[in-house]
Amino acid sequence: MNGDELTQMRLNAGAPRANQRVTGGVGTTMSGARRWIRAVAVVLGLATANVAHAQEAKDAPPKVTTPVFAIESDSGDNRLQIGGFLQAEGRFALNDEQQRVTDTFAMRRFRIILQGKLARHFEFYWNTDFSNNTLTLRDAYFDTVLSPAFRLRVGKQKAPFSYDRLLIVSQTLFQERGLSTNVAPDRDTGVQVLGDLAKGVVSYSAMVGNGPADGQLAEFDTNDAKDVYGRVMVRPWAHNAKHPLATFAAGVAASGGTQAGPVATFLSPGRQPFFTYASGTTGVDRRVRWSPQAVYFHGHFWGYAEWVRSRGDVVRGGVRDTVDHTSWQVSGSWVLTGETVVERNIRPRVAFDPPSGHWGALQAVARYQRLDVGENAFRTGLAAAGASQHADSWVAGLNWYMNQLVKWQLNFERTVFDKNAGTRKPENMLTLQAQFGL
């Protein structure tokens, strides 16, 4: 299964393809009180149960098929799809003389997803995580679909902002999301409108939500103020499928609001805090974010880049200042075994079968990224002692797709911190993750 949200996320603007149906598979008809229902088991559908999430998109490659389980009415107006995936990982810090990171094996994620459609125009998506002995509702929303150009979404959902954050977690190139997600919102609860215009050349999203801090999610609000989000992506050559840039997309996202509450802590790729504010610091008044972003896939290649800026007011005691954080990343990949990138995923031409000499597909990945904390946080004493102002990171790795259900990821990531971090040594992480989805 391929989905952090197991859905069809339109990453180019967050707009889904309306009324998309999974086809193929084995169907059985049964009589019901009100209508005939076809039970479809192991249907060939969109990448792992990623069939209804509305933020997948045109900056994505053609669809990949993979088994899903679904029940659908003969008319296609009603559908229930069941999916899920698990990710088990091993994390090991190399040359960790300061013992900041604990080497461990862990169940990173174990998610069950229900999604579907009712009465033709209404779609829903529920994503629950059972890992780490906790029960967490990651997403819960429903859409009212009027046309491909207009969809109304209500509930807990990903904020339409960072490209990296909008990627489905089971389809990311790397085990860890980029440093840029430290200064971008995660999930928010609110109302969003999204859709495609000009036959898919332009995709848009606009949302009003509670307004989480950088890198955080907002279950509910602690004040009356709200955040407003907007995201637009453009595919200039989308109408010409033969154009070499037909799948290129670029755009910008922005958010703004007046908020008061907790401030963010920025985490390294090893999930260790490298910047924290001094005790007693809170966010206050205005907060503005914006992010230009671009993505391109063609043949064996898939790459993307984004730059994120978060500017907000913070206060501690009698000290108040505006702090400006920025982060950027450039990521790329190449399929070594010749397969074509499909919807940010790889479908092996021949599935893993050692007796037949088949081993699946192999993909090489690389990324360089940087995060800069606002200088004012250090100049005015708002940063905690030992906090780092800069973090530079590069990662290289391999993704092994044994078949459409099983994926292995091996990453080595090195992060270097600036002199403000005192004696903090570079972080060297070797990580391995096994993923299974159905």
Predicted features along the sequence, with ranges:
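Sec/Tat signal peptide C-region and signal peptidase I cleavage site
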Residues: N50-A54
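Outer membrane beta-barrel
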Residues: P67-A260, D324-S356, A361-R379
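Extreme N-terminus of proteins, especially the signal/transit-peptide cleavage junction
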Residues: S31, D59, D74-N78, R424-P426
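N-terminal acidic, proline/glycine-rich, low-complexity intrinsically disordered segments
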Residues: M1-T7, Q55-E56
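Outer-membrane beta-barrel pore domains
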Residues: A57-P61, E97-Q99, P244, A253-A254, ...
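Bacterial N-terminal signal peptides
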Residues: R38-A49
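Bacterial N-terminal signal peptides that target proteins for export
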Residues: E5-V40
